[in-house]
From Swiss-Prot:
Residues 1-24, 73-117 are annotated as: Disordered. GO terms for molecular function: DNA binding; zinc ion binding. It comes from Fusarium heterosporum. This is Equisetin cluster transcription factor eqxF. It is found in: Nucleus. Its main location: nucleus.
Amino acid sequence: MADQVQDVHPMEWGPGKTPQGRARLPSSFDATVKDPVAAVHSENLVCRVPMHRIRHLESLVYDLMQNSSANVNQEQVGVTPSPGDQPHVPDYPTPSAAHAPSTNQEPASAAVSPADYGSMQSTGGGANYVGSAHWAAVLDGIAELKDHLDNEESHHSDSQGVDPPCLQVTGPQLLYGCPKPADKDEILSSIPARSVVDRLVSRYFNSFEMSPAVLHSVQFLKEYEEFWEDPQTTSPIWLGLLFTIMCLATQFEKSRLDPGVQSPAVLSMERELQEMVDTFRLRIPQCLVLGSYAKGGPFVLETLMLYIAAEIFLSNDAEIEIWILMGNTVQLALHMGYHRDPKHFKGLSPFTAEMRRRIWATIVEMDLGLSAQMGLPRMIKHWQTDTQEPSNFQDSDFDSATVEMPPSRLNTDLTPILYRLVKARLMTTIGYIWDFSADVRPYPYTEVQKMDDKLDQARKSIPECLKWHSMARNITDSPQHIMQKVILETVFYRAKIVLHRKYMFLPLAQSASSRRIVLESALKLLDYQHMLQEETQPFCQLYQERWRVSSLVNHDFLLATSILCYYLQHARGATPQLSESASFDETIMTSLSRSHDIWLQSSNSSKEARKVVRALAVILGRVNTPSADAAGESGLVFGLQSTYPPSTTNDYSQAPMITPTAEWQEMDGQSQWLPGPRVIQRLTYDMQRQQMRWGL
């Protein structure tokens, strides 16, 4: 019996083998053949294999696996797993407590299919793996899509040509070393005049809800004044922090430009802002390297966190380099002891302790979000940390001189930090679910039910001021507040899908419940995608906040789209008896059709959108419609132009230090870079009207 249970999981796999160790089917031929002659022979061989026979063989194998899984599940009934086979699913907050199902419960494991092992894609540089809960793995598990996606991707790669090796470095420059090391004088010379920096700092604090979780506004303003009094004595790391703030603020400013207006003045302003972004972006790693960031110290984590945020907003798709940079940040945080609560250590002031808790909570959240986007296990485990959650304070409630912290405000008090606190609590529960889904061992369905209850409880605990009801009931809220509510909803429904996905087609009574939860959650996510697409149009409520629909947010919509495609494939083919009603399937088709049109708009600037468009074209029967490559040159994302085209976003080697529209001026004996007049005019604002919201 034990041997039968162990067979559920892969013991070995590699080139030429399936996750079960068997020889691959013809449709799984490795596309990366080193010998050119062999490559031609392999291509001809694949072309000679009838695709209908491949699909038939795959269907037979899948049916055998389903039957085998059903037999294993029936034999497991009434048997308590051995300690070595039990999943490590802790009950909050005790990390070491494992739930052993009683003998009168049904410890049914999830059905095993090839997609349950994740997806491995061969590339020119190696192999890319994503877990089974990732949207790409879900699509790769649909047999009918394999030849379409592979052929289309190959065609797109051929049309793009071969990139010259080592001419450009994309992604976070910090991972590759600085191509242009700079000293402090050179770095200081690229800081704009104070009038411009003031406006950028204000834009950052008034636009970015992550700011109170990373920086204390009162303390930062003190350091900011000290910098202008004597720039030469400022540490390189703090300068890097300032550049991350300016880089983010300039991105926010650029996103406010109307993509529908292509006048010379607007185009000129867009170029100036992009040049500013490129300059600031290049200076950040230069400052970090100059300040020996790997040793840790003040402002290192804050700078790295905002640097990662800037890279996320500059990326149209998930980028492995950002996840790796997040790993470096986690390692530095562990090295600096942020994973242990400050109460264990004497000498830390109340102010320092509270800020360390804020920063650690944000790092945990970023780690989970980026790991989920990459389809990989998260780096921080719950049993590694005992740092308490931060309190609900206004920045005016405490400062560096505080001797004893005041009582935390109630959750009904909508402070700038409250959204981060509420999201951190929700992400704690979602983190358990992500660990749960990433566990390679089988686990009983009773554990899924327990985790589902935990997730529902976490959602119910969201304060009323941050709960989503409908767009009609949010018309008096600020756009930022609306987006916060939407994000809390999308991460909740994504977690529902991740938790129940493996049980969608399990041949047991519980599968119907899990299948319905997954499908309804996916439809909910696509409803939010459609709503955001409409509300981010010109003159709509979220138009100025459309930059918030980042690749992290789109990941949830990609998962929802893929899971609905996966369901339709089963409903039409392998397991039609497990399909829902015809009217429900029609609702899914309608939702996918709208989603297809949305993804099509961004398919020129996003390879992820391009892949899902091709998948939807097959599922919806639009194979003969214009492909993603012919979607037009608009590069639209939710009805707006892609803010940072791939051709200029990731090219550090071309980042301009001096631009035709920039001006130079002497200030305090130093040359300072001053943006063009259009940018200065754009950044002009009423300081008192946009006074910082942090209790000043």
